[in-house]
Amino acid sequence: MNISSRKAYIDSVFGQLHFQITGDGNPLILCHQSPSSLDMFSKSFEPLAQSGFQVIAIDTPGYGQSDAPKRQPTIKDYSCCIKDLIEFLNLENVSLLGHHTGACIVAELSLMIPEKIHRLILNGPPLLTNEEKANLMSMIEKAPKMKPMKDGSHLIDLWERRKQFTPGWTDLDAMHRGIIQMLRVNGDEIHGFKAAFSQDLEKVLSAIDIPTMILTNTGDDIYFAAKRASSLRPDFLFLELQGGTHDIVDEQTEKWVESVCEFLQNS
């Protein structure tokens, strides 16, 4: 099967928003974690397209190839950018999937335009307490800022930093590509985290009224938060893959794609 893929931009309140479309089936929007880009889903594009989806992956403003915001965005700001893209592409009956920060974004978006949403997948929703948010934010803010060094040691430092927050990592390619995305944001990765930690995700989750699945994996660094979200909404389908890290799409591509397709196509 010949799968078509193309990249494009639209204008947003934060500048140009970059996205990639693969396939020609039912629309499925993918929103990435922080700090990352649409590249975190790249291994899933073709198998999802082969399963009948038009995969629309988006670089959140400030990440990947989207322009950086000149002010601190909120999750609603990010969601409005995707809403504008849905309108630009004239999409209906759209499925949404977001990972970590992306889960916050698509959850918010599902409340904005529920009439356009078919199904929702929250991959590792960060339902955290205020104390947990404060602790994580403190760690992120205290992390050394990357400064280019003549001997290239800043690249080693960045590699060690990602190793520290990816315990149990196994996929070298995912680690390498993750470092590339961290280099892209050039120390400005904090926007996505601040937006996610400022959102009242519990309130948002409580208001969702469309078919939803919470997808997680037992090796995810916020696996506990996904379990907490499931306890809040026991009516949502809950599915956990075994092991892995926040690079689960790379580590277990086939199982991840199968889980996504089974939920979205079982209607």
PLM ranges: what are they?
Residues 196-209, 218, 227-230:
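Serine-hydrolase catalytic core
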